[in-house]
Structures are given as C-alpha cells and as structure tokens.
C-alpha cells in the first residue's frame, strides 16, 4: 500500500465522523423542535463509530506501512474505547435527565451507538497483530502461531464483543417491555434491537481476525461467521419492513426505515467477514470486488434518505429517519475504507 492511499483510507472515516458531528449539531441547534431532539443527538453520535473505525484503519495501515510502534497498539485502540465510553455516558445522561420523551428515545439510541463503538474498538484491538494474517494464510500448516494471541486473549476479545452485544439485546428487550408506558419505548426498543444486530455482526469480525491471527481459523469459521452477519442484516431489514407495514398510519412506523438502514450497515460489515473467509489459505478472484458492497449499501442509505426527505415535506414523521439514514450512509462509507484496507493487507498479488 503506497503512502497516499494509506492516508486516504485513514482520512475517510475521520471525514465521515465530522460530517456526522456537524450535521447532527446543525440539526439539533437550528430550531428547538421535538423531531430535532431525536435526530440531532443520534446523527451527532454516529460520528463516534467513525472515530472508532479510524482507530481500526490506523491500527491495520500502520502495520502495512511498517510504522506501528509498540506504544500505538495501546494508544490507538484505547482512543476508540474512550470514545465509546463517552458516547455511552452521554446517552445515559441524555435519557437520565430527559425533559421529554424525545430525549428518552435519543438517549437510549446514543447509548446503543456507544455499544457499537465499543465493539468496533475491540475490532481495532484484535487487529494489533494483523500482520500475522497474510503469513498464516500463506502457510498450509494449521499449527497455532506462537506470535499470535494466546487462547485466553482470543477468548477475551470475542467475549467483550459478546458482552456488548448481549447488553444491547437485553437493553432492547427491557425497552420493548415498557411499550405500555408510551409509544416512544417502542421506537427506542426497536432501534436498540437494530443496534444489537450490528453488535452481533461485529462478533463475527472480531472472531475472524483473532482466529486468523492465531491460525486457528477453520472451515466451520469460514462458513458460520459470514452467515451470522448476513442473518443479522436480514433480521434487521425484515424487522424494519414489518414495522413499516404492520404500523401503517402510526407515526412510529417510520422507525422501520431506520431499521432497514441498520440492516444495510450489517451487510456492510459482512463484506469484511466474507473477504477474510474467502481469501484464507486460498485464492479468490473477486476479492478486489468485495469493497463494492459497502459502497452500494452507502448509496442505498442515501437514496432512501432522499426519498424520505421528499416525503418529509408533507409528513414530519419522516424527518428523523431521513436524517439518521444520512448518518448511517456515512458509516457504511467508513466501512468501505476498512474492507479496502483488509483487501490490500490480505492480497496475494
């Protein structure tokens, strides 16, 4: 990877993060409005995921260009965890001191975004020995690489993402159990469920990276981890369609469009898991085409947002999903840079 491209792939997630920050801040501060109290904080804190993806990109790229100093393997992933902690804390603060139901929704969703950020930061941590993956892949033997992670470290990394995912799922269930207290708990619980799907998808990414670094990635991993991500994306997408159709005429049904966007983020994550599976100890002619997946999902998010912006001129219920989908499109494009880095790092050319 040449120096210019390495800079570009690190700049992309940072630029996307700041687009979310500025757009979210503009939405929230422009007018004091209920819909903006939901969309503003959510779009703003989606930028946290972009910063965590920057940490992942920087961790891998610095190894590829041979500038990954020992101290950086702690500082860069640590930065991601700090961002995740601040995001979760901000979400809890928002709904903890909520003046109305709008802030209750945005607070819970922001906390869920923080859980995703923590999962992405764990992916950055698991990538601190990424340089071993090409060597292990080229080696026909299946012996454990002693330079890789210990079995305990591998299990801790996978366990962390599992913990964050379970937290998101339990959180979603608790919110949905409170639907009787108000429709806003349905909205918050549904979106938290979609965020939980993304966290679960990231288990597959962390497990794939950690296992390939240790050279314990087997045929069952090659088959099952990509399936897990695709299932999560399908669950979120279909969940969104069900909400849209089953709640037609209800303002809450527009939440379904956000769920569809979250499903598209899962499909973006699948590009990385599929790439790692396809090129492990074998050649895959279409490996350099896999980065197109997050580009397509980003475009789908933005096109869907455009339709909802138009619909929002006549029905304010579409205000929130239109803005949130723009933020999700930015996250999908961040994932394009990550899968491109992975493709470059694992290429056998």
Residue ranges: model-predicted function:
Residues 133-149, 217:
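Membrane-interfacial, low-structure loops and terminal tails that flank and connect transmembrane helices
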Residues 38, 68-71, 216-222:
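Short juxtamembrane and helix-loop transition motifs at transmembrane-helix boundaries
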Residues 6-30, 40-63, 73-98, 104-132, ...:
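Alpha-helical transmembrane segments and immediately adjacent membrane-interfacial amphipathic helices
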Residues 1-3, 137, 342-349:
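Short, charged juxtamembrane terminal tails flanking transmembrane helices
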Residues 33:
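FAD-binding core/adjacent interface of flavoenzyme oxidoreductases
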Residues 69, 125, 139-142:
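Glycine-centered signal
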């Amino acid at each position: 990877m040449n120096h210019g491209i390495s800079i570009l792939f690190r700049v992309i997630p940072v630029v996307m993060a700041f687009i979310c920050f500025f757009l979210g801040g503009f939405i929230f501060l422009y007018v004091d409005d209920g819909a903006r109290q939901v969309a503003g904080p959510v779009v703003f804190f989606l930028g946290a995921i972009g910063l965590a993806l920057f940490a992942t990109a920087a961790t891998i790229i610095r190894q590829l260009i041979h500038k990954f100093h020992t101290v950086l393997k702690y500082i860069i992933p640590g930065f991601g965890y700090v961002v995740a902690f601040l995001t979760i804390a901000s979400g809890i603060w928002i709904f903890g001191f909520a003046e109305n139901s709008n802030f209750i929704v945005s607070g819970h969703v922001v906390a869920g975004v923080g859980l995703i950020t923590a999962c992405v930061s764990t992916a950055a941590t698991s990538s601190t020995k990424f340089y071993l993956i090409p060597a292990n892949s080229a080696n026909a033997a299946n012996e454990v690489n002693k330079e890789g992670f210990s079995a305990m470290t591998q299990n801790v990394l996978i366990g962390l993402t599992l913990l964050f995912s379970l937290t998101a799922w339990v959180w979603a269930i608790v919110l949905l159990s409170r639907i009787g207290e108000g429709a806003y708990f349905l909205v918050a619980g549904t979106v938290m469920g979609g965020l939980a799907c993304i966290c679960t998808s990231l288990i597959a990414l962390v497990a794939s990276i950690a296992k390939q670094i240790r050279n314990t990635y087997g045929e069952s991993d090659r088959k099952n981890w990509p399936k897990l991500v695709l299932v999560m994306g399908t669950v979120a997408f279909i969940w969104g369609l069900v909400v849209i159709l089953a709640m037609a005429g209800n303002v809450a049904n527009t939440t379904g469009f956000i769920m569809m966007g979250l499903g598209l983020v899962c499909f973006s994550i699948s590009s990385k898991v599929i790439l790692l599976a396809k090129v492990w100890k074998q050649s895959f002619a279409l490996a350099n085409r896999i980065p197109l997946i997050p580009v397509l999902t980003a475009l789908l998010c933005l096109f869907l947002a455009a339709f909802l912006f138009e619909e929002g001129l006549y029905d304010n219920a579409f205000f929130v999903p239109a803005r949130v989908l723009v933020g999700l499109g930015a996250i999908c494009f961040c994932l394009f840079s990550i899968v491109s880095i992975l493709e470059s790092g694992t290429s056998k050319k």
